């Protein structure tokens, strides 16, 4: 019991343990899963890449943020994600800058062909099954970002910075699938010849290939057995036999096993073993260097068999007749081309870092050691290239190149004037517009930091390294013209004053006069005259008392003695009031005695003002004088005080008593700015070279005293106060050292050896980019250096050295005897020779050297013949006979028969074995013929200025006599082209030509300025030019001319209106107009003298009276009156008071006078005051400045163009329109305009500046006729102003010399040579000839020596190919069919593409059904074509015949084809009814349904099929009465019967149901009966009495009802 219980417990424990283990494993796996799940709960998520920062180009850096994410989407600490798979945060990038848009662009290729869209997933049937017109497709194209400069591909992100990427695919349509279209079968061929089984065949050709998934072409051949095989007659075999030769085996050497002890050789026709045994008597060693290279001669065999016309083999004896074909021949053991080992890789072409992403390249090469022979493998490529990338930060940046320029050279006016007048010569200082030039060169760009560290300036390099347009080498410039100051007139002489009023000394002083500058001088040579003149004087006074007198007041009573009040002020020499303490002591008295006349006293007027001085200066002969006077107003009465004598009525005094010799200071021009030690030490700036550069200096000049009309005098004679400065500060010009570029690199010496003994030199140069100035370091003398290249070796000349030919090597004797059984060794063989390459000093060289310098390697092997006993033998050919000078002569050579051949009849046949060969002698007569058009007229080249870069007008020829050329085609007597040097030394015929010279418009010189058009005020001065010659032939055009062919310039001018004015003297005494002269009072007259004076000099010298204005001449006489003693005497009227500036008419003007003597009878005196209104232009005047228009732009006399000045003049005009003195406007303090001159620019007349002609380009063709070469020139400076326009001819062309073309021409393939067989494998050969032609190979090409064509471009395999001639019974391919017409792919009649297709095909011909399994496949060939047409295909059908007709497909041009038409739309060719018409009297109709015969009607079932044919009643009677109805029963068209057969009035249909028309007729009859009944009722009914009611009145409405109206 216990054991059982223990067992139970054990089982239970074991089961419990199993469950526990299972639970633990589940828990562990779950924990591992959770742990793994925990590891997979966090993932890295990178953000988008940021912008590329850093330098422009490939050195940029791009960064992005990287986060650690939980799978639920929330971010976590970075430590939760694994560091190993963390995405990168930074990467290098190409930073795109805006200027990159000029360097990169999208390059888009053409759209590729439209291809079908791939089938959708799960779609089984092709989409083309439902195609109607076209099917959907896709077109792709290549879009890439490229660098414009070298068309290299870069990252697309660069171009995306500027423009979106163009699409790379688009939808398109593909035409529906088009099956292969073939022509109709040709007629059956004739039955094969012979008796027995005969076959005939027919073929067809492909017209259009299958396209767009269409069906492939069907078989193009059909064969069938002839119907009636002809039995062979007795004695004639059923089959024909042909000798079939097989292909030659590979060339091999004899095996040891082929030779047995008996000397017999067992031939192995099929052996292609590579095992070789070299027999010494069968090989010839060709020594090359120290290593032997044997050319081995082996043999090759072929099989010969007899084949029957049905393709079966037959006994060989049935085919052999006269001779047995050759089955073994000598051959060359093939040897492959042998090359040397590859050289080491060259350094990578990219050796620096640049912005280009294009990799570099490196290459390696190998040489040919032995050429391939015997059909061995040709030489492989001898040069190998591959891309390479050199990486690393230590790699230096690639140099960048940019255009650099020197400073502009000095402006040269001569360059401009030479254009206008080639014979112009400098006659004085020139200024104005000119041309300045500079050097333009290409140099390596240096970073700014490096440029600061390095003192060496840039080095010029080749200009081809710089891209982009070069800076202009010349430009217009301007030399400022110098103009002198414009000054005003001299002022009046001042008072005599001390030289220094602050420290007066001595009794001598100076009187001065001034003038001021109206317009400053311009330019470096502009000069101002002296502005102050002085004269010495006595008793100088700097300050003076100026007293004004009042009227006389009586001291007692009303007359008698009295006094005047004096008012004195102290004034300086300028008339300004100053303190009285400055004037001399004592001051003038305040009172002055005077006398008032009593009633009977004589009355005198007041003294007049002192007149102007009679002279401007005094000399020994005369002095200047001034006068004043007074007049008698009333005579004295009885007892009164008498009048003074006439002498007492005038007073005189001296004036301008100074000498006429004026003194003034003169100055020399300012000297150059020089250093002042003290000033320079304080202001200098120190440059990097430690020398003083710029600062402040001083300028000095000499000052000396000049006496007018005498010259220089002692300086103390001139007042020191007006002495000009002799020293002034100036800016020191910076010292400019000459700066030159570094020398360019030496031009490279040739790495390759040089032919001949010519001296090769290399050179370098440097360019002056800054000239020395202001004492700087001068430029070096050497700017160009040249030296001879060292270690330049002469190229050795290599040539081939062939050895003698070896003896003729035949097939091995054992092989030969094994086949023929003859011991005679004769027939065709091969002979070899060694060819080595040697130098000109007979040293061995590599074969590659000779291959480079020669036109190919000489032959190593050639065929030879060992004559047999039966062969004809000859002596060697003699030399050709000498030629005479006659071109008709021939040369010949001879040979003779030798030995027994002289007696053999076949050897006497001169056609087979000619003994004389004749050739035409070379002829030195050549025929020249002009070809092509004449070239442009070409002028000789002109001189070029090396530093200006411009063509010198005087030396360059743009017109005149030149030459034009025409090519010469030279040919020999046979019409073959030869080198043109045989006919002409240059290959051209030339003749003189003339290019008309342009003549510019020529005008005269400027006339002198005319006088001012106005003598007073503002006028115009004019000068003019007139036309001398008109322009023609493209000369400089004329400016705009007037009707008189003149051009004018006008400038304003001004004449001072008071320059010449009338000066009046004092009035004389009044003379009474009384004849008796008894009365001494009353009216009378008085006179005065007038004269015309020039007031411009300030003194008023008398001039001719005609110069003054005659309209303003003052009166010389006037009426006057002397008051009688008893009359009241008044003084003369004083001046009118001033009117306001506005001339207000409400304002009055007043003048007064006072009583001098009362009347005796106490009568009232005349008025003592007068008033008048201020009226404009009567007694009140206004003044204003008047400005002229700007003048034309005025240049200096020596300036042709450039900076000028435009001026305008200022005048003062009265309100009445009359010009007045400028003083009037100045006195009223009117605002003066500021700018009286402005700068202007006269456009320079610049002729078009052209570069020199470039060198002639290479001929557009290497040989032949039709080639052209050209040269061009460029516009350096376009025409400006009225310059000579640029010529339209910037390119010149001429025909190239007609040189002969030499080409290798392959001949046609020969017929297949079987070498004794009737069919089988043979060989075709063709010739390779050197032909000469004039550009196109045609029938006119002639054959010449092979050496003229150079190295042969073809291998032997191109000149020989295997071929086969089918044996009777063999299945073989036909020749190619003709190319079909060009057909386009079209949709709905419109072309789908521009290029069409045409096809041709080859099919097979079966000659025996037994061999049809071995037939080759038919071949289809398609090529593109142009000029195609759209064709459409339609089904055509013939008329029915016994329910059958012919259906075919026809192309739109009428060609019957197979394919092209839709199979679904094919019409039926056989007419049949389903099910068949088996009912009595039924037949199958054209519609394909059963119908009934005539006289029966169809009874149809519900499903539309015929049930039975029911006889039409009465049809028998009509049939029986044939005689009576014969005239009516004419034949009726069965089709018409079928049409109207269904119209019989049968009430039942074939199914027995009532027809619809029966129901219609019944319904219609019922309606008619009801209508008749109703009508009868109305007619019979009694009518009711008629009652009418008045119509109801409707209200009238005026509304318009449009609907009612409508």
Swiss-Prot record:
Residues 1583-1606 are annotated as: Disordered. Glycans are attached at residues 150, 190, 219, 683, 757, 842, 933, 1186, 1308, 1456, 1524. It is a single-pass type I membrane protein. It is found in: Membrane. Keywords: Coiled coil, Disulfide bond, Glycoprotein, Membrane, Repeat, Signal, Transmembrane, Transmembrane helix. Its main location: membrane. Residues 32-1555 are extracellular. Gene3D superfamilies: Thrombospondin type-1 (TSP1) repeat. Residues 40-98, 102-177, 179-233, 336-392, 399-482, 484-543, 601-661, 662-735, 737-796, 797-869, 871-924, 925-998, 1000-1125, 1127-1181, 1182-1245, 1247-1302, 1303-1368, 1370-1431 form the TSP type-1 domain. Disulfide bonds join 411-477, 431-481, 442-466, 602-643, 613-617, 655-660, 738-779, 749-753, 789-795, 872-907, 883-887, 921-923, 937-993, 959-997, 970-983, 1001-1038, 1012-1016, 1120-1124, 1248-1286, 1259-1263, 1296-1301, 1371-1415, 1382-1386, 1425-1430. Residues 1-31 form the signal peptide. InterPro entries: Spondin/Thrombospondin_T1 (IPR051418), TSP1_rpt (IPR000884), TSP1_rpt_sf (IPR036383), TSP1_spondin_dom (IPR044004), TSP1_TSH7A-B_C (IPR056991). The chain crosses the membrane at residues 1556-1576. It comes from the Eukaryota. Residues 1586-1595 have a biased composition (Polar residues). GO terms for cellular component: plasma membrane. Residues 1577-1606 are cytoplasmic. GO terms for biological process: actin cytoskeleton organization. SMART domains: TSP1. This is Thrombospondin type-1 domain-containing protein 7B. It comes from Homo sapiens. The gene is THSD7B.
């Amino acid at each position: 019991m216990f054991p059982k219980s223990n067992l139970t417990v054990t089982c239970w424990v074991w089961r419990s343990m199993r469950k526990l283990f299972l639970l633990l494993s589940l828990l562990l796996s779950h924990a591992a899963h959770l742990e793994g799940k925990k590891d997979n709960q966090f993932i890295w998520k990178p953000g988008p890449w940021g912008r590329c920062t850093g330098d422009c180009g490939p050195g940029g850096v791009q960064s992005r943020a990287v986060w650690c994410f939980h799978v639920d989407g929330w971010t976590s600490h970075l430590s939760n994600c694994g560091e190993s798979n963390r995405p990168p945060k930074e990467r290098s990038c190409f930073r795109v800058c805006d200027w990159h848009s000029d360097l990169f662009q999208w390059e888009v290729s053409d759209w590729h062909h439209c291809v079908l869209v791939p089938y959708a997933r799960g779609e089984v049937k092709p989409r083309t099954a439902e195609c109607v017109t076209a099917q959907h497709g896709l077109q792709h194209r290549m879009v890439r970002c490229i660098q414009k400069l070298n068309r290299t591909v870069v990252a697309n992100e660069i171009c995306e910075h500027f423009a979106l990427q163009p699409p790379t695919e688009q939808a398109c349509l593909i035409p529906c699938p088009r099956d292969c279209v073939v022509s109709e079968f040709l007629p059956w061929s004739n039955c094969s010849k012979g008796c027995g089984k005969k076959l005939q065949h027919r073929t067809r050709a492909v017209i259009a290939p299958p396209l767009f998934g269409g069906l492939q072409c069907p078989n193009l051949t059909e064969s069938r057995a002839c119907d009636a095989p002809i039995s062979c007659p007795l004695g004639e075999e059923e089959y024909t036999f042909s000798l079939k030769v097989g292909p030659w085996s590979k060339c091999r050497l004899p095996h040891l096993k082929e030779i047995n002890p008996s000397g017999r050789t067992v031939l192995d026709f099929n052996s292609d073993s590579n095992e070789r045994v070299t027999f010494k008597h069968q090989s010839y060693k060709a020594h090359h260097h120290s290593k032997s290279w044997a050319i081995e001669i082996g043999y090759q065999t072929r099989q010969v068999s007899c084949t029957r016309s049905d393709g079966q083999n037959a006994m060989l004896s049935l085919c052999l007749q006269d001779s047995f074909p050759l089955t073994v021949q000598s051959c060359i053991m093939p040897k492959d081309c042998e090359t040397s080992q590859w050289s080491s890789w060259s350094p990578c072409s990219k050796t620096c870092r640049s912005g280009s992403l294009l990799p570099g390249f490196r290459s390696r090469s190998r040489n040919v050691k032995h050429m391939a022979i015997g059909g061995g493998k040709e030489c492989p490529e001898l040069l190998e290239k591959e891309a390479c990338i050199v990486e690393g930060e230590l790699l230096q940046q690639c140099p960048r190149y940019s255009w650099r320029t020197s400073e502009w050279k000095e402006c040269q006016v001569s360059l401009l004037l030479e254009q206008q007048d080639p014979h112009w010569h400098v006659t004085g200082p020139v200024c104005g517009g000119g041309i300045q030039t500079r050097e333009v060169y290409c140099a390596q760009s240096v970073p700014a930091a490096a440029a600061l560290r390095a003192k060496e300036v840039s080095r010029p390099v080749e200009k081809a390294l710089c891209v982009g347009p070069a800076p202009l080498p010349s430009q217009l410039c301007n030399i400022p013209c110098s103009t002198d100051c414009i000054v005003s007139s001299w002022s009046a002489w001042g008072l005599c004053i001390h030289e220094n009023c602050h420290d007066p000394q001595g009794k001598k002083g100076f009187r001065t006069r001034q003038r001021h500058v109206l317009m400053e001088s311009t330019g470096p040579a502009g000069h101002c005259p002296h502005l102050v003149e002085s004269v010495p004087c006595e008793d100088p006074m700097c300050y003076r008392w100026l007293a004004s007198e009042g009227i006389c007041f009586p001291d007692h009573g009303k007359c008698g003695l009295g006094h005047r009040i004096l008012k004195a002020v102290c004034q300086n020499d300028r008339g300004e009031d100053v303190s009285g303490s400055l004037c001399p002591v004592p001051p003038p008295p305040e009172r002055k005695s005077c006398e008032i006349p009593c009633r009977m006293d004589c009355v005198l007027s007041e003294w007049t003002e002192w007149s102007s001085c009679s002279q401007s200066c005094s000399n020994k002969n005369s002095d200047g004088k001034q006068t004043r006077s007074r007049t008698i107003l009333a005579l004295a009465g009885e007892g009164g005080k008498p009048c003074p004598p006439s002498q007492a009525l005038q007073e005189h005094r001296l004036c301008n008593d100074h000498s006429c010799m004026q003194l003034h200071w003169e100055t020399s021009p300012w000297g150059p700015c020089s250093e002042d030690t003290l000033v320079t030490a304080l202001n200098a700036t120190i440059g990097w070279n430690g020398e003083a550069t710029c600062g402040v200096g001083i300028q000095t000049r000499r000052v000396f005293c000049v006496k007018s009309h005498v010259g220089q005098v002692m300086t103390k004679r001139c007042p020191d106060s007006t002495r000009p400065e002799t020293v002034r500060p100036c800016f020191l010009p910076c010292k400019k050292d000459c700066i030159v570029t570094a020398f360019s690199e030496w031009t490279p010496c040739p790495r390759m050896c040089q032919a001949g003994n010519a001296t090769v030199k290399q050179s370098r140069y440097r360019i002056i980019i800054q000239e020395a100035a202001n004492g700087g370091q001068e430029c070096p003398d050497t700017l160009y250096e040249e030296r001879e290249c060292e270690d330049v070796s002469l190229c050795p000349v290599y040539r081939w050295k062939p050895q003698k030919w070896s003896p003729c090597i035949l097939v091995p004797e054992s092989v030969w005897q094994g086949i023929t059984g003859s011991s005679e060794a004769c027939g065709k063989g091969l002979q070899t020779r060694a060819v080595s390459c040697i130098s000109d000093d007979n040293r061995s060289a590599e074969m590659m050297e000779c291959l480079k310098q020669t036109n190919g390697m000489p032959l190593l092997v050639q065929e030879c013949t060992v004559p047999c006993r039966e062969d004809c033998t000859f002596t060697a050919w003699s030399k050709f006979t000498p030629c005479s000078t006659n071109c008709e002569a021939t040369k010949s050579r001879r040979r003779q028969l030798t030995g027994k051949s002289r007696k053999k009849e076949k050897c006497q046949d001169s056609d087979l074995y000619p003994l004389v060969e004749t050739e035409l002698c070379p002829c030195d007569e050549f025929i020249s013929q002009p070809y092509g058009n004449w070239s442009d007229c070409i002028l000789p080249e002109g001189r070029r200025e090396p530093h200006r870069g411009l063509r010198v007008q005087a030396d360059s020829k743009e017109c005149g006599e030149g030459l034009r050329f025409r090519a010469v085609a030279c040919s020999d007597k046979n019409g073959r082209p030869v080198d043109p040097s045989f006919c002409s030394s240059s290959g051209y015929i030339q003749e003189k030509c003339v290019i008309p010279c342009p003549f510019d418009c020529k005008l005269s010189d400027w006339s002198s300025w005319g006088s001012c058009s106005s003598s007073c005020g503002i006028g115009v001065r004019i000068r003019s030019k007139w036309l001398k010659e008109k322009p023609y032939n493209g000369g400089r055009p004329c400016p705009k001319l007037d009707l008189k062919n003149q051009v004018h310039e006008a400038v304003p001018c001004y004449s001072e209106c008071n320059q010449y004015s009338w000066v009046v003297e004092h009035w004389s005494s009044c003379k009474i107009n009384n004849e008796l002269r008894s009365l001494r009072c009353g009216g009378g007259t008085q006179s005065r003298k007038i004269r015309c004076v020039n007031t411009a000099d300030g003194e008023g010298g008398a001039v001719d009276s005609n110069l003054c204005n005659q309209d303003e001449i003052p009166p010389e006489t006037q009426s006057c009156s002397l008051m009688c003693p008893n009359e009241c005497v008044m003084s003369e009227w004083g001046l009118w008071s001033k009117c306001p500036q506005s001339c207000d008419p409400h304002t009055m003007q007043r003048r007064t006078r006072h009583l001098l003597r009362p009347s005796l009878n106490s009568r009232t005196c005349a008025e003592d005051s007068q008033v008048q209104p201020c009226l404009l232009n009567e007694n009140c005047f206004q003044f204003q400045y008047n400005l002229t228009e700007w003048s034309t732009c005025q240049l200096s006399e020596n300036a042709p163009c450039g900076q000028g000045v435009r001026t305008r003049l200022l005048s003062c005009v009265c309100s009445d329109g009359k010009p007045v003195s400028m003083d009037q406007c100045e006195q009223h303090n009117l605002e003066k305009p500021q700018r009286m001159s402005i700068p202007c620019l006269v456009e320079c007349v610049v002729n078009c500046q052209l570069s020199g002609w470039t060198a002639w380009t290479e001929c557009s063709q290497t040989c032949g006729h039709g080639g052209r070469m050209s040269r061009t020139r460029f516009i350096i400076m376009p025409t400006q102003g009225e310059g000579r326009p640029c010529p339209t001819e910037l390119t010149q062309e001429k025909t190239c010399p007609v040189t002969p073309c030499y080409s290798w021409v392959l001949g046609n393939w020969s017929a297949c040579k079987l070498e004794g067989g009737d069919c089988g494998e043979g060989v075709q050969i063709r010739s390779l000839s050197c032909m000469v032609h004039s550009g196109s190979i045609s029938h006119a090409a002639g054959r010449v020596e092979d050496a003229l064509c150079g190295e042969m471009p073809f291998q032997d395999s191109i000149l020989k190919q295997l071929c086969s001639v089918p044996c009777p019974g063999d299945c073989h391919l036909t020749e190619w069919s003709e190319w079909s017409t060009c057909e386009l792919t079209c949709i709905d009649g419109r072309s789908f593409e521009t290029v069409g297709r045409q096809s041709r095909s080859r099919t097979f011909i079966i000659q025996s059904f037994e061999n049809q399994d071995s037939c080759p496949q038919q071949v289809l060939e398609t090529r593109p074509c142009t000029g195609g047409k759209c064709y459409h295909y339609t089904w055509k059908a013939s008329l029915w015949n016994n329910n059958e007709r012919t259906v075919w497909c026809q192309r739109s041009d009428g060609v019957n084809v197979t394919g092209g038409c839709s199979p679904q739309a094919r019409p039926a060719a056989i007419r049949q009814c389903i099910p068949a018409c088996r009912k009595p009297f039924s037949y199958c109709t054209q519609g394909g349904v059963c119908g009934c015969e005539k006289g029966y009607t169809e009874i149809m079932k519900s499903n539309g099929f015929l049930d039975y044919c029911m006889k039409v009643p009465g049809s028998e009677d009509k049939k029986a009465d044939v005689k009576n109805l014969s005239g009516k029963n004419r034949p009726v068209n069965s089709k018409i019967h079928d049409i109207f057969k269904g119209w019989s009035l049968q009430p039942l249909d074939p199914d027995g149901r009532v027809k619809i028309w029966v129901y219609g007729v019944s319904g219609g009859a019922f309606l008619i009966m009801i209508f008749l009944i109703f009508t009868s009722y109305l007619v019979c009914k009694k009518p009711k009495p008629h009652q009418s009611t008045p119509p109801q009145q409707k209200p009238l409405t005026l509304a318009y009802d449009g609907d009612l109206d409508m």
